[in-house]
Structure formats: structure tokens, C-alpha cells
């Protein structure tokens, strides 16, 4: 996923950062929009530190002190962009820009992220349907269900390939889904069948909750981590929609690609990283004091409460 190149000082390259809820993606595009460098990494909520590391790495390995056009996108990118003066572009707009550039015949985009889901209708104008208020039916939901089945997301995908039947499972909320999945586990249902049912639930949630009756047809594009990594999820969408969707090369990177294409302001990346250092040093956060000032205070509290108990009848 990574390719090095030697940059001439007269080259105009574009850098796009997509900072999502769980991952950070970065691309470098050449003068003709060719992909020169890309990376996809989890940030484990250390967004600031990971962004600084990436900016310095790209400068050292790719740009060698040269300026680059830069913009930032993603659900977790706005505050970071504001703090260092880099233009921010909304992720839906970034996706549309990249799709129009690299997959111009697309009629509809289905994108599942870590904690949100989107459908972009691109025919007869642009219409966006997005669920950003609940993680049901997203990558976080799939990870939660995989944990319930005591396997990784990759193992759950492989198990689902061997399914013989499916069950009805709610995906609007992980709590409701767990109340459907746990009884199936207790009753001895095949893990393979439960796994396939979970993917089917994601499909039903996306179509019913976002499409809301509007037909999904034509050239369908699948983007985002869950649809990139899960063959069963893509197949489930194909079967439900009666289409053959496309998961393009670099499907994980389309928001970052759109951010790079949108970029129109030059920066030295090490200077942006330094600006983030200054922001980190001066930022203040509103918070409540801890419940206990020390471990000893907590242990005293715990012992006091444990000394009182309701008599058993």
C-alpha cells in the first residue's frame, strides 16, 4: 500500500488526511493525480500524536522539506484542522470528489465506517443519507458482535462463508443485537450461521434506515473498512439489492483522496506538525475532578461499603 518516490522541487503534490473515529488514512497524489503514497492505520484515540507522526514521516520519506498542498477530512479531523490552520473538507464532499474523479460512472455509493454509515445517490443530482448518531450497523457494531462470538472480525467473515441459514437479528443497536445473538449462542446455533446473520442485519439496517424506500440501482460502489475487508458483507449487499457492486482499488482511502484533490493551500508538513505541538501544549480541557484522590481513598470507600450487606433470607 506504500510506494516511495523521489520528489523534484518543482513538483506540486497533494496530501490528504482522513481522520476517522478509529483510523487515520493519508495519501500523497502526484501532479497527474496518481497515487504516490498511502497509509491506513488505527490511531487508538491518540489522534493528535498519530497525525504528527504521519506528517513528519511523509516529510522525511517523501517530501524532503518541500511544500505540498494539504487538507484534512474525516469525522475526527475538524478540530485538528482548526488547531493548525489547515483547510478542512467535509467527508461526504471528499467522497463525492474522489468518486467523480476516479469512478465517474458510479450511480450510488454505500460507505460503512467505524461508527457511521452513508449512502450517496449521485444520479439526478446528489443526495446524501447518513447515520452518524448511532454505531449500529457500522464497523464498531461488527467488532462488537465478533467479540461476542469470541473471534476477530476476519474470523467472523470466514465463518460466515460456511453458513447454511440465517436468523433475524436487530442491528439498530448493539444492545438489542446482543439480546438476539446471545440466545442463539445459548441454544447451540452454529457460529457460522450467526455470523452470516449479523452481516445480513447490517445490510438490512443500511438499506431500511438510510435508503428509506429510494431504489438503490445502477453502478454501486462499496467503500469503507467493513465493506473492504468482508467479502460476505459485500455479497449480502449484492443479494439484497440484486446488483453486482464494485469495491474499487484503494476503497479505504476515498475520503483521503478527495481531501487531497480538494487541497489548494501549501504547507511544509513539519511546520504543521510543530503547530500541533504548540496546540497540545496550550490546549485546555473542561473536566470534573476524580471521584477518588488516590487508590487508598478508593480502597477505604470499597471496604466501608463491603462491610454492609443485606441479610440473605
PLM features: residue spans?
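Glycine-rich phosphate-binding loops at beta-strand->alpha-helix junctions
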Residues: 76, 211-240, 251-255
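Glycine-rich phosphate-binding loop plus the immediately following alpha-helix
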Residues: 46-47, 124-165, 173, 252-255, ...
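Acidic, glycine/GT-rich loop-and beta-edge segments that sit at the periphery of enzyme/chaperone cores
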Residues: 1, 265-313
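Adenine-nucleotide phosphate-binding core of ATP-dependent small-molecule kinases
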Residues: 177-210
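Short glycine-rich, Thr/Ser-proximal phosphate-binding strand/loop in the N-terminal lobe
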Residues: 14-49, 53-57, 132
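Gly/Thr-rich phosphate-binding beta-strand-loop-beta motif of the actin/hexokinase/Hsp70
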Residues: 4-32, 106-123, 165, 313
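Short beta-strand-loop/turn "lid" adjacent to the catalytic site in phosphate-handling enzymes
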Residues: 40-43, 58-93, 120-129
Amino acid at each position: 500500500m506504500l510506494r516511495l518516490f523521489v520528489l523534484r522541487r518543482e513538483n506540486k503534490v497533494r496530501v490528504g488526511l482522513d481522520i476517522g473515529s478509529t483510523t487515520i488514512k493519508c495519501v500523497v497524489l502526484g501532479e497527474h493525480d496518481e497515487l504516490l503514497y498511502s497509509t491506513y492505520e488505527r490511531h487508538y484515540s491518540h489522534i493528535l500524536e498519530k497525525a504528527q507522526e504521519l506528517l513528519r514521516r511523509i516529510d522525511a520519506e517523501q517530501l524532503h522539506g518541500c511544500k505540498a498542498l494539504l487538507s484534512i477530512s474525516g469525522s475526527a479531523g475538524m478540530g485538528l484542522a482548526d488547531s493548525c490552520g489547515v483547510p478542512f473538507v467535509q467527508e461526504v464532499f471528499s467522497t463525492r470528489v474522489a468518486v467523480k474523479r476516479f469512478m465517474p460512472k458510479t450511480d450510488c455509493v454505500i460507505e460503512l465506517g467505524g461508527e457511521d454509515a452513508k449512502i450517496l445517490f449521485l444520479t439526478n443530482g446528489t443526495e446524501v443519507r447518513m447515520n452518524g448518531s448511532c454505531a449500529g450497523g457500522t464497523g464498531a457494531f461488527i467488532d462488537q458482535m465478533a467479540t461476542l462470538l469470541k473471534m476477530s472480525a476476519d474470523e467472523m467473515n470466514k465463518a460466515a462463508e460456511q453458513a447454511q441459514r440465517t436468523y433475524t437479528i436487530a442491528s439498530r443497536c448493539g444492545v438489542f443485537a446482543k439480546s438476539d445473538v446471545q440466545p442463539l449462542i445459548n441454544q447451540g446455533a452454529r457460529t457460522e450461521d450467526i455470523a452470516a446473520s449479523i452481516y445480513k442485519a447490517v445490510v438490512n439496517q443500511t438499506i431500511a434506515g438510510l435508503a428509506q424506500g429510494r431504489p438503490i440501482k445502477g453502478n454501486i460502489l462499496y467503500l469503507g473498512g467493513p465493506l473492504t475487508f468482508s467479502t460476505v458483507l459485500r455479497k449480502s449487499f449484492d443479494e439484497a439489492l440484486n446488483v453486482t457492486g464494485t469495491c474499487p482499488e484503494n476503497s479505504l482511502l476515498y475520503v483521503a483522496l478527495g481531501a487531497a484533490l480538494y487541497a489548494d493551500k501549501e504547507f511544509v508538513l513539519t511546520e504543521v506538525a510543530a503547530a500541533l505541538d504548540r496546540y497540545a501544549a496550550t490546549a485546555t480541557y473542561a473536566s470534573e475532578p476524580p471521584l477518588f484522590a488516590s487508590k487508598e481513598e478508593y480502597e477505604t470507600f470499597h471496604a466501608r461499603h463491603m462491610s454492609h450487606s443485606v441479610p440473605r433470607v
